[in-house]
């Protein structure tokens, strides 16, 4: 009987602490997916265009740059 009481009280306590934690952390994670998406877009390797000095064989150069033949035979983004 005592063991059953202790188990019931501990389950109620753990459930209450989980609910309190969930309510507390809800506002902190509201836009987490959008923030991670924006961070991925800003990474240097995730850009859609090649910057000055980068190769332009597999992707186009950024606006204002043109693809010029490089010394190794591949194209390089230059002004």
From Swiss-Prot:
Propeptide cleavage-removed residue intervals: 23-47
Gene Ontology cellular component annotations, sorted alphabetically: extracellular region
Pfam families: Conotoxin
Leader sequence residues: 1-22
Keywords of the record: Disulfide bond, Hydroxylation, Ion channel impairing toxin, Knottin, Secreted, Signal, Toxin
Main location: secreted
4-hydroxyproline PTM sites in chain numbering: 60, 63
Superkingdom of source: Eukaryota
Example GO molecular function: ion channel inhibitor activity
Disulfide bond sites: 49-62, 56-67, 61-77
Organs and tissues of expression: Expressed by the venom duct.
Subcellular location: Secreted
Protein role: Ion channel inhibitor that inhibits the increase in intracellular calcium upon depolarization in DRG neurons. In vivo, both intraperitoneal and intracranial injections into mice induce hyperactivity.
Domain remarks: The presence of a 'disulfide through disulfide knot' structurally defines this protein as a knottin. The cysteine framework is VI/VII (C-C-CC-C-C).
Family affiliation: Belongs to the conotoxin O1 superfamily.
Protein name in the entry: Conotoxin Tr6.3
């Amino acid at each position: 009987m005592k063991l059953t009481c202790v188990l019931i009280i501990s389950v109620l306590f753990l459930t209450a602490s989980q609910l309190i934690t969930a309510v507390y952390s809800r506002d902190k994670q509201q836009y987490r997916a959008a923030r991670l998406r924006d961070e991925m877009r800003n990474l240097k390797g995730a850009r859609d265009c090649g910057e000055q000095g980068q190769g332009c064989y597999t992707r186009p150069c950024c606006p204002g740059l043109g693809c010029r033949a490089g010394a190794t035979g591949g194209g390089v983004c230059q002004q």
